[in-house]
């Protein structure tokens, strides 16, 4: 990521479509962001992070009708569930979270600007559509060739990938607009929110999964370029797929591990450890064996934070900086190699500082002030070579630490 000479970072990450519970794979990007943002703050960066909630969508309408409740009831439930998940997995809330339905007027204004500039037309369903052929660099985000996107049935005057800005419909939740009754398209929702919140500026960083590169990120960029002549983001951060037992994790395939179910069964720090151990774009195959290995690793990390109380050497600031920089650059495997080297060298203060910046929940574990007296007693017993009594105190303190 090229963040040179930037101290105030404008960042966006697409949020969930709130018609069901999020699965563990949905959390990969935001957990990585949570850790990287803390690393950036450690270097003096200020983070302005916008995260959206898609609370109007065909899937939402279908689910609400199936359950016999309103879209608002359904989305309120799953939005609150999502916020609970963020808390459980120790993910800091973004600077600003915005629901699409709260910004319909802004989205309509945004679409009007695109129409006024001549980037739109009405399709056979009377939906207002964006004409991608009006964007000379369409495909720059995804590497698509514009020639391959042409629709052979329209004599090369239209593209099969022209996308809906405003869908004309009265099914489910819909809104009044200059384009008729309907609701906005997904690609436009995100682009309009970015344009509004960041005052037409390009983002310093846009995040999302690799599955969103085309068409979602490409279409966001096309709209922003149409209105400003600039890309929607100067840097992109994308995370790879999370598979479950060798198969794609997807609700449509009924092959998911819900985040809430993971947290009921395992320590949430385990998934943070997994996500931060593998370079971001590399696919992860989540298995019981992988979870078990990282469970052992978290226990090891907890012990290191406990050992720090007995040997508070000065942290090596340059080593902390080196590791955090590697995480910022997305070189997770190399960063973890250096952490293992520091563990071998018993640099507990340095390692603990790194873990604090990666926002592992276990860093909140502590020994209370009353325990400090026991540590003094332990030191005295060690000096007196009364190792059996010292060991008893250490075991007592470990219990206090684990339960803190």
Swiss-Prot record:
Any GO CC annotation of this UniProt entry: cytosol
Motif ('KMSKS' region): 248-252
Gene3D superfamilies: HUPs (3.40.50.620)
One GO MF term: cysteine-tRNA ligase activity
Keyword Lipoprotein tagged: no
Cofactor requirements of the protein: Zn(2+)
Superkingdom as given in the UniProt entry: Bacteria
Main location: cytoplasm
Manner of cofactor binding, per the entry note: Binds 1 zinc ion per subunit.
Pfam family, one: tRNA-synt_1e
GO biological process assignments: cysteinyl-tRNA aminoacylation
Localisation: Cytoplasm
EC number(s) on file: 6.1.1.16
Keywords of this entry: Aminoacyl-tRNA synthetase, ATP-binding, Cytoplasm, Ligase, Metal-binding, Nucleotide-binding, Protein biosynthesis, Zinc
Annotated Zn(2+) binding sites: 14, 190, 216, 220
Enzymatic reactions: tRNA(Cys) + L-cysteine + ATP = L-cysteinyl-tRNA(Cys) + AMP + diphosphate
Residue window of motif 'HIGH' region: 16-26
Ligand binding (ATP): 251
Keyword tRNA-binding in annotation: no
Family as reported in the entry's similarity comment: Belongs to the class-I aminoacyl-tRNA synthetase family.
Binding partners and assembly: Monomer.
Name the UniProt record assigns to this protein: Cysteine--tRNA ligase
